[in-house]
Design a protein with these regions (language model features):
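Short, small/polar residue-rich loop motifs at catalytic or cofactor-binding pockets
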Residues: 34-36, 61, 111-113
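His/acidic/aromatic-lined binding-pocket segments of jelly-roll/cupin-type domains
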Residues: 39-40, 47-48, 57, 65-68, ...
Length: 242
C-alpha cells in the first residue's frame, strides 16, 4: 500500500488525477482514530491538525508541497517554505479537486459527495477535478463546497461553529437535532441514530467532543428526548415518554 501511495505523487497530474478508493486510507502516511485529533508540522513549517477518523498522504518534491486528504477533515496553517529561494506551491488534493492556499489558515473536509472548504485567514483557490477556466477564489470568513465539476453553490459566510473542533468543541446554533447527532456520530465508535419524531428539534449550545456520553446526557436533560442504548455502540435518541 505504501508503494502505491508513493506512486500517487509521481508528478502533480498523476497524483491529483488518480481515482480515490477507500482502501487507500488504510496505508496513509498519517491517520487518526475515531475521536482522536492530532497536530503535525511538515518540513516547510505548515501545520496540519487532523480531526477524528482522518487520513492523509504527504509528498514534497521540487515543485510542490502536497497533502492528499484521503478521508476526514484537516485544518491547515500554511508555512512559508523559507528554505527555498522560490517557495513551492502548497496543494491539498481531495477526491473532488485541489485546494491551493494563498498564505492562509483553512480547513478541508471530505464529505463523500463533495469537499467542504472553510477559510479563516488569507484565501484559497479551488480547482474542481473536471472544471475548466480560472479556479474560484474563496476569501477569509467564507467557505464553499465543491464537486468534481464545480462549486456546489455560492460561497457562504462562516458561522461561529466553523473550526471549533480544533479546540475540541462542537458549537450548535439553532441546529437540527438530527444534524447534531450526525456530528456526534463522527467522534464515537458504533452508531448514533436519531428517531424521525425528534429529528427537527432545534439545539443550541457548546459541547465537548472528547466526552460524547456527556453530550447525550445533556440532550436528555434539556430536550424532550430519551437516549436508548442497545449497547454502547448502538444508540438511538427518541421522543421522551410521558
Amino acid at each position: 500500500l505504501k508503494a502505491l501511495a508513493v506512486l500517487l505523487f509521481a508528478g502533480g497530474g498523476a497524483w491529483t488525477g488518480q481515482a480515490y478508493l477507500p482502501w487507500r486510507a488504510w496505508g496513509a502516511d498519517v491517520r487518526t482514530a475515531l475521536g482522536e485529533r492530532r497536530t503535525i508540522t511538515l518540513a516547510d513549517g505548515t501545520t496540519v491538525v487532523l480531526n477524528t477518523d482522518t487520513a492523509i498522504d504527504i509528498r514534497f518534491d521540487d515543485a510542490t508541497r502536497g497533502v492528499r486528504l484521503l478521508r476526514g477533515e484537516i485544518m491547515v496553517t500554511s508555512g512559508r517554505d523559507a528554505a527555498r529561494a522560490v517557495p513551492r506551491a502548497l496543494v491539498i488534493a481531495t477526491a473532488h479537486g485541489d485546494v491551493r492556499p494563498v498564505g492562509t489558515r483553512f480547513s478541508v473536509r471530505e464529505r463523500g459527495d463533495a469537499t467542504r472548504v472553510d477559510v479563516f485567514d488569507g484565501a484559497v483557490r479551488i480547482a474542481p477535478r473536471r472544471a475548466v477556466g480560472r479556479a474560484p477564489l474563496i476569501t477569509a470568513g467564507h467557505g464553499a463546497d465543491f464537486t468534481r465539476d464545480a462549486l456546489a453553490g455560492p460561497p457562504r459566510v462562516l458561522g461561529a461553529s466553523a473550526g471549533a473542533w480544533v479546540d475540541g468543541i462542537l458549537v450548535a446554533s439553532n441546529l437540527r437535532l438530527a444534524d447534531l447527532l450526525a456530528e456526534i456520530d463522527r467522534y464515537r465508535p458504533g452508531r448514533v441514530r436519531c428517531d424521525a419524531a425528534v429529528a427537527n428539534l432545534r439545539v443550541s449550545g457548546t459541547y465537548p467532543l472528547d466526552d460524547t456520553d456527556r453530550i447525550l446526557d445533556t440532550l436528555r436533560e434539556t430536550l424532550p428526548v430519551d437516549v436508548e442504548y442497545l449497547s454502547r455502540y448502538w444508540v438511538t435518541v427518541v421522543a421522551a415518554r410521558d
